[in-house]
A protein has these predicted regions:
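RNase H-like, Mg2+-dependent phosphodiesterase core
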Residues: 1-207
């Protein structure tokens, strides 16, 4: 048995075939949105390119995203901007997004596999899997969808705000990003002002 399909194979034996994988991307970023995605694959779907999106090249992620668009039974995502993440907190934002997507598509799902998080306000049975994007093809597929969608947004933001290097750092706290923040300050509605590094930067500027 292919390890990336181990959880799915167990569910197939229980006559559960429409298995949704859910994951988020962008939780630890200092800038940009948080994206939550859902993906339902056909039974026994096989694509050896699929793995944890963080371990894939950008080219392969885009290729798999296009394949999933054509071949998956369902893919969908929801985008939460930096303001929402600031008001709600990143963990809760992830859970809200997962619950929304599960309930939106409840009639098309038999069971949900979720990366790390536990959800409660849903009408479908779920299972939380630690490091699920490394263990489940369904979760890994959702991770790829969320990553490609978010990277595209960050590439667009890079065109609007070229001084921050968003196309390269994707909103994470890289050396260049830190230097740009120190020089130009955070961008309203783009940076996450509730995050400690941004808070500290603003405090230092006041002193």
């Amino acid at each position: 048995m292919w390890k990336m399909r181990e959880f799915e194979e167990k569910l197939y034996k229980e006559n559960l075939y429409k298995i949704a994988g859910l994951d988020e991307v962008g939780r630890g970023c200092w800038a940009g949105p948080l994206v939550v995605a859902i993906c339902v694959l056909k039974k026994d779907y096989n694509n050896k390119l699929i793995k944890d999106s963080k371990k894939m090249s950008s080219k392969n992620r885009k290729l798999v995203f296009e394949q999933l668009n054509r071949e998956a039974l369902l893919i969908d995502w929801i985008i939460y901007d930096a303001e929402f993440v600031d008001k709600t907190n990143p963990k809760k934002t992830s859970i809200i997004g997962m619950e929304y997507l599960i309930n939106k598509h409840k009639d098309k799902i038999d069971y949900c596999l979720i990366d790390s998080e536990k959800v409660e306000n849903v009408l479908v049975k779920t299972q939380s899997i630690i490091k699920g994007d490394q263990k489940s093809i369904s979760i890994a597929s959702a991770s790829i969808v969320a990553k490609v969608v978010r990277d595209d947004i960050m590439n667009q933001l890079d065109k609007k705000y070229p001084l921050y290097g968003f196309s390269k750092n994707k909103g994470y706290g890289t050396k260049h990003h830190i230097e740009a923040l120190a020089k130009y300050g955070p961008i309203n509605k783009i940076h996450r002002f509730s995050y400690k590094p941004i808070k500290n930067l603003l405090l230092n500027k006041k002193e």
